[in-house]
Swiss-Prot record:
ATP binds at residues 177-184. It comes from Nitrosomonas eutropha (strain DSM 101675 / C91 / Nm57). It is a peripheral membrane protein. It comes from the Bacteria. PANTHER family: ATP SYNTHASE (PTHR15184), ATP SYNTHASE SUBUNIT BETA, MITOCHONDRIAL (PTHR15184:SF71). InterPro entries: AAA+_ATPase, ATP-synt_VA_C, ATP_synth_F1_bsu, ATPase_a/bsu_AS, ATPase_alpha/beta_chains, ATPase_F1/V1/A1_a/bsu_N, ATPase_F1/V1/A1_a/bsu_N_sf, ATPase_F1/V1/A1_a/bsu_nucl-bd. It catalyses: ATP + H2O + 4 H(+)(in) = ADP + phosphate + 5 H(+)(out). The lineage of its organism: Bacteria, Pseudomonadati, Pseudomonadota, Betaproteobacteria, Nitrosomonadales. Produces ATP from ADP in the presence of a proton gradient across the membrane. The catalytic sites are hosted primarily by the beta subunits. This is ATP synthase subunit beta 2. Its EC number is 7.1.2.2. Residues 11-24 have a biased composition (Polar residues). GO terms for cellular component: plasma membrane; proton-transporting ATP synthase complex.
Length: 485
């Protein structure tokens, strides 16, 4: 954590900025800088008394090197703060310095290729970004008249997603699943596939994830040659709940600058949005708020909206977001999962049953949805093939119980054909990932939408099957020799 002198220098640098929005923030800050004393310490919550110039909600204050954000005003002179760094060494009566402004983070091309924390400070061992502009992490979402809706899809190269749950450019897509079904591997593959073909800027925001995953991702993106057009931000699971709660807003502030000021399209990948909700619940508990359903904070819907509503497209550019969402105990009626669902244009549901069968990615073809899967957007052929695939897999699900009780031989010829098609479709929708090459031993494959449609169409047209269904497992595009019989 940087010392107090460095913070003062950063504030002075902000005052010299040519950015009008930042100059206005600094002008307001000069009216609110004050000194206070620590009044009470309760875990990560610190009460501070100010005699004058009481800081505002979201303002950043410092007690030595300890950073805190003002979360509540208790009375005329007392504020309640959430610690953003360890409180070790903090004592009653210690002086507290108010900066007069929220957290300000560097934005612009200077942050590309860097790994940063919630304060915009480097955690990659390199010098601080040489940025001339900084912005507050607390920004209002664009007004309705500035928003635009795109009717184009973002091709991922992953068959199951592109076919059944296409991602909207400028939309929000959720990867839902319980523990151990492959959310992080899938989002890492999406980074590998989309960042290399994405013409704009990519941001990865790790909320409450393992430090090991951050290091691996940083190295892999360097090896893939996409790090120079990517910003990585982390609020790791070992950090204070306030950090995990705010790091998503830091990522959005940087993404908004690329979109609004530089006119670029942004790909924002978040792993994991549930950790944002979890951190909000911890902060709410520290502040003494009464919990709501299943122990979540009463402000769950408001806090999610404050994050999700900033992810949108404007006339200047688009922010396309792909978010991993942990589902506690595989319960999709959990309030956190239910609230996140309502903000998304596409939902990719990962099934534990499919994962247990070795069908990776474990995308549930019947539960995954997208508003983009309409003839007007993807075309009539894509729409018809996707519907036929879903119908075939749904019929197979209905036949599973009969097969388990009586055996496959007791089915009619038509039903046996449905089962053969469905099992081949299930295996064809599996795919070797570039991000999993090191532990799977399979060479990764990126498959175009056209190749995916052609492969599914050929399987759906088959009436007799001379090949083995295992031949369709963990391949990319369907080889030419696999023709209908």
């Amino acid at each position: 954590m940087s010392g107090m002198g460095e913070k003062s220098e950063q504030i002075s640098k902000s005052a010299r900025s040519t950015d009008p929005q930042e100059q206005e923030s600094v002008a307001l800050a000069s009216q609110c800088v004050g000194e206070g004393r620590v009044l009470k310490i309760r875990g990560g919550v610190v009460d501070v008394f100010f005699t004058e110039h009481i800081p505002r909600i979201h303002d950043l204050v410092y007690a030595g090197d300890l950073a805190m954000e003002v979360a509540a005003l208790l009375d005329q002179g007392t504020v309640r703060c959430i610690a953003l760094t360890p409180v070790r060494g903090l004592g009653l009566g210690m002086p507290v310095h108010a900066t007069g402004a929220p957290i300000q983070v560097p934005v612009g091309e200077a942050v590309l290729g860097r790994m940063l924390n919630v304060f915009g400070e480097p955690i990659d061992g390199k010098p601080a970004p040489n940025a001339t502009i900084s912005r507050s992490i607390h920004q209002a979402p664009p007004v309705l008249e500035e928003r635009v809706v795109h009717s184009t899809i973002l091709e991922t190269g992953i068959k199951a997603i592109d076919l059944l749950s296409p991602i909207e450019r400028g939309g929000k897509t959720g990867l839902f699943g319980g523990a151990g079904v492959g959310k992080t591997v899938l989002i890492t593959e999406l980074i590998n596939n989309t960042a290399q073909h994405h013409k704009g800027v990519s941001l990865f925001c790790g909320i409450g994830e393992r430090s090991r995953e951050a290091e691996e991702l940083y190295r892999e993106m360097g090896e893939a040659g996409v790090r120079d057009k990517t910003v990585m931000l982390f609020g790791q699971m070992s950090e204070a709940p306030g950090v995990r709660f705010l790091v998503g807003k830091t990522a959005l502030t940087m993404a908004e600058y690329f979109r609004d000021d530089l006119g670029q399209d942004v790909l924002l990948l978040i792993d994991n949005v549930f950790r944002f909700v979890q951190a909000g619940s911890e902060v709410s508990g520290l502040l003494g708020r009464m919990p709501s359903r299943v122990g979540y904070q009463p402000t769950l819907a408001t806090e999610l909206a404050s994050l999700q509503e900033r992810i949108t497209s404007t006339r200047k550019g688009a922010i396309t977001s792909i978010q991993a969402v942990y589902v506690p105990a595989d319960d999709f009626t959990d309030p956190a999962a239910a609230h996140i669902f309502s903000h998304l244009s596409a939902s990719v549901v990962l099934s534990r049953k499919r994962a247990s069968e070795g069908l990776y990615p474990a995308v549930d073809p019947l539960a995954s949805t997208s508003v983009m899967l309409t003839p007007a957007v993807v075309g009539q052929r894509h729409y018809d093939i996707a519907r036929a695939v879903r119908r075939t897999l749904a019929e197979y699900e209905e036949l599973r119980d009969i097969i388990a009780m009586l055996g496959l031989e007791e089915l009619s010829a038509a039903d046996r054909t449905v089962v053969a098609r469905a099992r081949r479709l299930e295996r064809f929708l599996t795919q070797p990932f570039f991000s999993a090459e090191s532990f799977s031993g399979e060479i990764g494959a990126r498959v175009s939408v056209a190749e995916t449609l052609a492969g599914c169409e050929r399987i759906l047209q088959q009436t007799k099957f001379a090949d083995d269904e295992i031949d369709y497992y963990m391949i990319g595009a369907l080889p030419e020799q696999k023709t209908a019989v």
